[in-house]
A protein has these predicted regions:
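Walker A/P-loop
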Residues: 22
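Post-Walker A helix-loop "phosphate-sensing" segment adjacent to the P-loop in P-loop NTPases
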Residues: 29-39, 52-55
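Hydrophobic anchor at the beta1->P-loop junction of P-loop NTPases
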Residues: 11-13
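ATP-dependent small-molecule kinase phosphotransfer cores
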Residues: 41-117, 121-126, 144-148, 164, ...
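NTP-dependent small-molecule kinase module
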Residues: 2-6, 79, 103, 151-156, ...
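ATP-binding Walker
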Residues: 16-19
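Short, well-ordered beta-strand core segments
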Residues: 115, 133-138, 191-193
Length: 227
């Protein structure tokens, strides 16, 4: 299914770690043929570069690396190791790092008028204006369920880590995201809450689709159609 109307559709998906927002963004993007941008991958890629190259001056190094970065390239990398997870939360607190990645995100958004942006501050800082999102979702999940999902993903990558360690790691990451000074994890006033621990994938996509199509009908009236 895709949009007959060529007008913009910008969807923001925010939420805590392992809340299901990445899965939701991928499924909705596939259904409506939207470009899907995962901001978490950008920060994880930055962490991977720093861990690997150990630059003396991080900001000039990252600015150069992100200048001509091909987003599709990083989607093919394994960026979900626990080492990167432990590093990325502290990197994401840095204002100048966030500015570099924000510039890259804005460039991608200008290139794709029909896009789904997923992360922790997409509605509040990235798609908040010029341009603004058409609809925003905020994902929540029971901490135990989120930790178990994350632990299963790590096990498939042969990561040696216990479920309790994953649970503690997610707790710390979410606390850092909420409390950080620049672009903290917050729910925008008009975001629609999606509780993924109470929905399977099909039900989640159905709920999101109803909200998206309701919003598009209000925006475009009877000229709105999907194909």
């Amino acid at each position: 299914m895709s949009l007959n109307n060529p007008s913009p559709l910008r969807v923001a998906c925010d939420g805590e770690s392992s809340s299901g927002k990445s899965t939701a963004a991928k499924l909705i993007s596939k259904k409506y043929k939207l470009f899907c941008m995962n901001s978490g991958l950008l920060f994880r890629y930055a962490s991977r570069l720093i861990i690997k190259h150990k630059p003396k001056k991080i900001i000039p190094f990252l600015r150069k690396k992100f200048k001509n970065l091909n987003y599709k390239y990083i989607t093919r990398l394994n960026l979900h190791s626990q080492e990167i997870s432990n590093h990325v939360a502290f990197l994401a607190k840095q204002k100048r790092v966030r500015q570099i990645i924000r510039i890259f995100q804005k460039k991608i958004i200008r290139q794709h008028h029909q896009i789904c942006c997923e992360g922790r501050d997409q509605a509040s800082a990235i798609l908040n204006k010029n341009p603004r999102y058409d609809i925003a979702f905020f994902f929540k999940c029971n901490p135990s369920t989120a930790a178990y999902r994350r632990w299963k993903d790590l096990k498939t990558s042969n990561e040696q880590i216990t479920l309790d360690e994953v649970k503690e790691s997610l707790k710390k990451r979410n606390e850092l995201d909420v409390k950080r000074r620049f672009s903290p994890l917050i729910q925008s006033k008009d975001s629609i809450i999606i509780r993924t621990d109470k929905l399977n994938k099909k039900a989640m996509v159905t709920k999101m689709s109803k909200e998206i199509e309701k919003k598009l009908l209000l925006k475009y009236g009877r000229n709105f159609r999907t194909k």
